[in-house]
């Protein structure tokens, strides 16, 4: 989202006077005279009634009024501005409809970008900004990823508690529209806990697992098991379910669902989507150890009909998690490569062996090229001697 600098031609006193008159004319309970306590008291009074303009004003007119209020706010010293900024942010969350919510969002974004980057108030503005963005379906305009979020607060990082609160909000506003992003947010949230306080993150850990399982684009689930709050769930059904998605095959999930159907449904997980994901994960696991698989093997392992094999493999190839070739004539699937479901010691050893083999091959090639080069030089010298 773009934001323009705030510039108002009138003096502060003149702006305050005009704003007071404007809101009084709209019927707000406010005096048209300036406060003798100073501009901060004026702002408190103005912000207290500023939402009256939401009733009948045009969005463009309201944007101008809010812009004027912001231009005054950013002149207030940091040590005296917190209550003013918080009061304004709270008012901006009260927009009665989507068009006005967009105006409020723009105003908060303007305030956010005009505050000093080292100001701790930016966190509070951003938190409310996300709330308003949800109201007008503009979340991705203000939040595109965790890295972008951290860069916003590089000069004044919020506390762990503040970030946990913000991550929970971001998860809530993205879970219905972008499960992949929501899952990344929850993983980041769990990463803010330490061994000392991980035990209190039970609810967050469960949300993180459910979000990751529900995301149709998240397949590498092994890293979740290493998160401290997730470890505290060992022995719980949700941890057992996660373990199945990490390393077990489809029959294990089917059995779990038969035994704990109510639990799976209570978590908001869709059984058919779970089956689809487990089939893909099972296929990946089979591909790790089998360079080729028959259609008969796939129908048995994936619990699908033979007619469903080809469409299934095509869907797998679209994910780019597996590289393979269909052999319809021989009713086989030939595997070129696959992403591993887990990446532990065996996978590191396999990678080490592969790199060692590459190193040896490169050494052989270099030695061969050296010999060819030496032979060419000898041949050239001999030809010179002959002539």
From Swiss-Prot:
Component of the eukaryotic translation initiation factor 3 (eIF-3) complex. The eIF-3 complex interacts with pix. Its main location: cytoplasm. GO terms for cellular component: cytosol; eukaryotic 43S preinitiation complex; eukaryotic 48S preinitiation complex; eukaryotic translation initiation factor 3 complex, eIF3m; Golgi apparatus; investment cone. Keywords: Cytoplasm, Golgi apparatus, Initiation factor, Protein biosynthesis. The lineage of its organism: Eukaryota, Metazoa, Ecdysozoa, Arthropoda, Hexapoda. Belongs to the eIF-3 subunit M family. Pfam families: eIF3m_C_helix, PCI. One of its GO terms (biological process) is formation of cytoplasmic translation initiation complex. The keyword Protein biosynthesis applies. GO terms for molecular function: caspase binding; cysteine-type endopeptidase activator activity; translation initiation factor activity. This is Eukaryotic translation initiation factor 3 subunit M.
